[in-house]
Amino acid sequence: MKDLFGQAILDYQTNNFPEDLYTETSISELDVMPIDYLFRDYKEMPSLEKKALDLVKGKTLDVGCGAGSHALYLQEKNIDVLAIDISPKAVKACQLRGVKDVKVINFLDLDESVKYDTILFLMNGTGIFQNLLLINVYLDKIKKLLNDNGQVLIDGTDIIYMFDEDEDGGKWIPSNGNYYGELDFTVHYKGEIDETINWLYLDFETLKNACEYHQLNCTKVKTEEDSYLAKITL
């Protein structure tokens, strides 16, 4: 991985001739992602993210922290928050921004002896699951990291709206055998192209069913068009 996402974040933070990111998926063409959007403050955040941050309690883990905007807001609210990301460059930018506790680590590699009251997966938090099969691995890890009264706050989007309808109102979905939200995701930055990764857009009912299989409770907290914020508890 070239870590172009992290490079864009670090370039913006250090004023190193930053440019916008471009992303594409297996069902969508190149789309611009303004880099300053990753540096937004609370009042500029979508309502789902605001709601999630309002619900945070206790010792908190911010997974896939990116530029650290959520962690910074929680710090200001005197929340004990650990921010993590697999991008060393994004973590460096977080440190420069003033995030106090931020580490380069994969969520699945976290020490299970340390428990959390809140675990955040935001900005299409279900993406980290990659595909339907790996959801089981992540939910199992979540169970080991949550305190008894802890919560996971995760947002996701049902992308069924991106597929064409037939005359009967049904959706034309490619018959490759995969779940329609399992996409290939590619980042472009400054003329370079990063390695394609797997990214999961997950509808709420599928998330809920997966949670129930693992004896986890999953409730929908808030919806916004085709996106939702869910709360997962033991």
Name what the model sees in each region.
Residues 67-78:
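Conserved SAM-binding loop of SAM-dependent methyltransferases across substrates and taxa
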